[in-house]
Every structure is written in structure tokens, then in C-alpha cells.
Amino acid sequence: AANVNLRHGVEDVRQLPMEQAVTFMGQIRSAGRQEMRLPGRYWRNNKMDLATCLKKMELVGVLAFATVDSEGAPQIRNISAIHYEPDALYFFTARGKNFCKELMEDGRVQILAYTKYKEMIRLSGKAYAVAENEQKKWMDIIFEEQPYLANVYPGDTREIGIIFCIDKAEVEYFNLGVNPIFRETYILGNVSVKEKGYYITESCIGCGTCMKHCPQKCIEKGTPFVIRQEHCLHCGNCYENCPVKAVIRK
């Protein structure tokens, strides 16, 4: 952020490309000025997208993978042996691990990344084992990108490994470090997204109770009133306090 220093305000930061702005915000926090926050519309105008989410996941490096075991209980572990393509994720594990067993039996997985800028990225999809004739290709790529793996699986011992792929997923971006908060959902591959959150129906009487109870002030007047979905926390305050039950939950 060469053209901005710590004396400048939010208006100056808004003019920066996203990556420079992120760097600058890190400088602000290091200097103890955590009260300065970029507005949610900054991130919207700078077009957060799937590619940026995947890049942020790659930069975080170690991601939390959640699966379901044979008894229906959630299991979670950290995974870093991951290779990123624009349209897919490939990752390595060993065939003898419970993680592999869960992926082979069920396949459903959620991956969570959390950045130092209070951004959360959650990928929900289904993993499958890569075709046998593609296993070596992706394994070699992952071992080249993650040199530590050679210490974990030296020489031919890597052959106990198996490569899984996720190429269809819902990717949710949720940023608590901006005001108002910012959220958006992206698609990896050909999948449909289930609608989430709260919506105001035609039963709205325009009393404004929902606006008063919204912590992010993301409800706008109208007929009916409208919730700005990209800034909604999904806290349910509007839903619980509407006097005529005009707010519905998807």
C-alpha cells in the first residue's frame, strides 16, 4: 500500500485494489488502530469471487476438514496436503486412515478456512477418489508443492497414499472484519445452492421493528421491507421480533 500511510482514512483505502487494502489493514492492526474498518460495500465493489476464495484457502494452508463417520458422528482434522486448480481441489491422505474410510463410505466433506482478517471460507461438497491412472500425477504434484511430505512418507512409502478430488461444491465467504459484515456464496462445478437466511414477505406492515433489532442495520424500508442478504448475520432477531410474523426463514 505504497500510496497510503497510517494517517489516511477509510476514503483513501477504498481507492486501493483489494490486495493492497488487505495489506494496509494489517498495518493498521499492527499499529494498534483496530477501530478503522472497511465498509462491507468495499468488498462487494472489489468483486470477491470463487477464485479469490480458493486463493485465500491456499494461503491459509492448513484447513479443517469435517467428515461423517459410520455412526453418523462428525469428525474433523487438519489437512495441508492440498493442490488447487481453478475448478477443483485435490488432496492426499493414506488409505489406512479413518479419514480415508469416511471419504470412501460417505464422501461428504466441509472444509473451513479462517484468515487473520476475520474472514471465514467454508466449502461444502463431496469428495471422490481420483481414477487410478491419474493418482500418480496428482500425488507427484502435491509432494512437489508440499516438501514436508517427503519426511512423512519417504521413498516408496507414499504409495500407501490416495488422492481425492472435490470438483462440485458450495463455497461460502463470510467476513466479520468489515462493517457491515459481508457474506456471499459461490459455486464450484455444477451444483445447486439451497437458499438460506431470512426474508420479509408481503405480510410486512412497515412498522420498522425489524430494523430496530437488526445488529448490522441491513434492513431497508420498502413494501415490503427488504433484508440486504450480503450483510445479514442470520441471527434471527428480525424473525423473533416481527409482530405479524412477516419474516420467514429459508
Annotate the PLM regions.
Residues 82-118:
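A short mixed-secondary-structure module that forms the rim of ligand-binding clefts
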